[in-house]
Amino acid sequence: MTRTILIVGATGSIGLHAARRALAAGYRTCALVRDRIRAARLLPTGTTLLVGDATDTPTVANAVEDVDAVVFTHGSHGGEGEAESIDYGIVSTVLGALKNPDVHVSLMTTIGITVHDSLYNRATQAYDWKRRSERLVRRSGHPYTIVRPGWFGHNEPDQRKLVFLQGDTRRVRRSSDGAIARDEIARVLIDAIAIPEAAYTTLELVSERGPEQPDLVSLFAALEHDEPGTHDAILDPDTLPLSAEPPAVLEQLDAIGRVVAPHSSAATSRGFGAS
């Protein structure tokens, strides 16, 4: 049976690659888009276009019906209030609409997400809200893979060997933290859906010189899994303590975490690769 993926942010620079990767892998690939004409021009043939606003609950509920996975490649652009409404709000809306606990969630955020005292974050709160979106995903009970890519497109042409890191230790906030090709980000987000070892993991993604690996199973297998029901990745520094979070954020985190699916056997019980 053909499985269905919904991509949120499909017309962005990563989303376009994600759609191509998903179609090539044989998934029925849906994209939630605001502008049908623009999306039809940009997205590959075979993509099913669902027109609507990703912050609108009825629209999202219709879009996620019968999906097997959701892939988030969306992102804000630094405007006032955008980080909360887009980076966090869209994830919250989609998770709230999902009824099937087995739906896999692939979420793209950013390397350096645990650095909250930078000038950029103080101005936009982007990293605060991206990290809060990660927390929602972890507490939701859904099988998930959270990918924190390095600097998009700063890689050299021969820099295709993927490197998975954990603990968010590259925190300079410059390209020296690591670079990655856009299509490789999409590859990890899409391929993770069918790799049981990828479930319940958080990783930073960069590349180094050398050819890309033929498959990602061994890379995912080497990662530490997040603790069940946790809010932060297993090796993350506690730089955004829950004790200092706004009440509304804590209430939403508590609400989404009331029913947390166990994932001690994530490798076989939930990943698509188990079927």
Question: What is each PLM-predicted segment?
Answer:
Residues L6, A10, A31-T93, A97:
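NAD(P)H-binding glycine-rich loop region in Rossmannoid oxidoreductase-like domains
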Residues D56, I90, S133, A181-E184:
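Conserved cofactor-binding/catalytic machinery of classical short-chain dehydrogenase/reductase
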Residues S76-D168:
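Glycine-/Pro-rich loop/turn segments that contact NAD(P) or position catalytic residues
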Residues T4, T11, S176-D177, R182-S275:
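Mid/C-terminal beta-alpha module of Rossmann-like enzyme folds, strongest
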Residues I14, V70, V137, V147, ...:
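Non-catalytic, hydrophobic alpha-helical segments
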Residues R3-Y27:
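N-terminal Rossmann NAD(P)H-binding glycine-rich loop of SDR-like oxidoreductase domains
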Residues G9, V33, T109, V206-S207:
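Short beta-strand/turn micro-motifs composed of small residues
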Residues T2-R3, V103:
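Nucleotide donor/acceptor-binding cores
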